[in-house]
Design a protein with these regions (language model features):
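N-terminal leader/linker segments that precede catalytic domains of diphosphate-processing enzymes
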Residues: 1-160, 166-287
Length: 287
């Protein structure tokens, strides 16, 4: 059975205990300005935490072809951020919204919310961190199925081009942390930029995918999406993860592991100070 490493257990415990500061502006936002993403963690066979990431379809209007967490806009103001994130994860990668439909023996635990971020489209985005793990009451001591093969089985070809995972702790490191041979190329680079008159650290991570099963959509006749088939190999050897997603990964890893990154970064978690100062523009969608 898969056992969490001590540092992975401690990371989950920190996230479970974390409480983000109050953010009253969220309640004043219309549904059209609200969004949420699912930062889904799970343990690999070595007990290390990995995080699920998608590549957005090239056909999407916003952020096409970029790496992102499963997530999207609110349907109504009655949806909680976690409900938004879980609904979008169902639509994008087939992760059931109903916990009772998660394949046994797995459960999804909502660990915490991270402080809000501001997308270039003016959406206020709430990251929801969750942990996919076996339910102790359903484990009989036998070998657990591989999460990559069991829990990410279906894609929506209209929204997702690929689903892959990345080593969570590595988002605090300037170089590849995985053991064994890795494909050529760097893991990290970064630069400072100006974002709404704020200095904002732009992180670029290049995630190796040569030793994992990357799930992609398969097209039925007529262009309709069918069951996705995992590919043992792909032309790419690294996927670029950057922008708001990269910033959220750094923030989440900092909180989880209680460590600071090996590279320069923004001290604040999220963009809540910026969002509060830009409230009128956000509400008027002038960003």
């Amino acid at each position: 059975m898969i056992r969490l490493l001590t540092k992975s257990k401690a990371a989950i415990a920190r996230l479970r205990a974390y409480q983000s500061p109050p953010f009253p502006l969220w309640d004043r936002l219309p549904a059209t300005r609200r969004a949420a993403v699912l930062v889904l963690l799970y343990a690999d066979r070595a007990g290390e935490l990995r995080v699920v990431i998608t590549m957005r379809s090239a056909t999407l209007r916003n952020f096409s072809g970029q790496a992102a967490f499963p997530g999207g806009k609110a349907d109504s103001v009655d949806e909680s951020p976690y409900q938004i994130a879980r609904r979008e994860a169902w639509e994008e990668i087939g992760l059931p919204m109903d916990d009772s439909k998660i394949p046994a023996p797995f459960v999804i635990e909502n660990l915490c919310y991270l402080p809000h971020s501001l997308a270039r489209t003016g959406l206020v985005v709430r990251p929801c961190v969750a942990f996919l793990h076996p339910d102790p009451t359903k484990v009989d001591g036998s070998e657990l199925p591989n999460v990559d093969e069991t829990l990410i089985p279906r894609l929506d070809a209209k929204e997702v081009a690929a689903v892959f995972s990345a080593p969570f702790h590595n988002f605090l490191k300037a170089q590849d942390e995985e053991t064994g041979p890795v494909p050529s190329g760097q893991w990290y680079e970064g630069r400072w930029t100006d974002y709404n008159d704020y200095r904002w650290r732009l992180h670029y991570f290049y995630v190796p995918i040569d030793r994992q099963r990357v799930t992609r959509p398969k097209e039925r006749e007529g262009g309709q999406a069918a069951l996705a088939e995992p590919e043992e190999s792909a032309p790419e050897v690294r996927f670029k993860v950057w922008g708001m997603t990269g910033r959220m990964l750094v923030d989440a890893a900092r909180l989880a592991y209680g460590e600071e990154p090996e590279f320069e970064h923004n001290e604040d978690y999220g963009d809540e100070k910026m969002i509060n100062e830009l409230e009128s523009q956000i509400l008027e969608t002038k960003l």
